Amino acid sequence: MLNLKKSFTLISIALISTTSFASSHDHGNDPINSDHALRAILQCMTKVDNTLVINGCNLHIANGTGYTHKKNNVSAANGVGNLILGYNTLKYGSQTPELDRRGSHNVILGDGHSYQSTGTLITGRNNTVTGQSAVIAGSGNQISGYGSAIMSGSNHTIEANHASIFGGTNNTIYADATWGSISGGETNRVYAQLASVIGGRHNSAFGIASSISGGQFNQTTTSAPYAVVVGGSDNKSGSPAAVVLGGRFNEANGEASTVAGGFKRSTTGIHDYRAGSNFFSNQ
């Protein structure tokens, strides 16, 4: 009951202070207008059991700097103006980190988070955000890029702008991989713009707008924009628009060439084609 009383006391002080400031600014510190403004605010608030309901009003939280993100290349972040749901403890589990919480204008849920920027949505636990306008969930994840998102999973890192990771663990999108994405899997890496990895483990997309779907230890190289690897193990697409479809230790090194399965098959010419040893064995 004591905590509830304290909460309502703090709310009342905040409302009175805010209303007094607005009234003095607009009405020359007229106490009558101040009282009317306060009554108008309180009309939006009702208590239902243990719930404070705000109906018909906006809840506006700001940090007092006068701007949301940056102005004249100076950050608006000053550690206040955040909406924090829950206890926001410094510690979750056995760890006792020193957390940087200089951020402002963020929505924060869960414990053990570090937030230094503005305009982010943070949930889960033990996540770190230094990039603006990010969304982060899961646990032990980090975002330093602008407008990027980690939607679930653990121990992911995004350095690029406008990149995304959905699920899995220990996946990384590096700084040059703007608009890159990883969907699930483990220890996958994206290095180039618009590149993507879907599932699998230890796959690396170096080619611009290249894609790897499943499998393990597969790679598209820096000289292979628009290349594709689908499944298999230790396969490599090393030329523009080249494709490897499954198998092991296959390489598509000719432009727009295809290797369809098999073991240690390779292409070198434009539009070349190779397949596994069980069919088209003489090609």
Residue ranges of predicted features:
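Bacterial N-terminal signal peptides that target proteins for export
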Residues: 1-9
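Periodic small-residue-enriched repeat registers in elongated scaffold domains
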Residues: 29-283
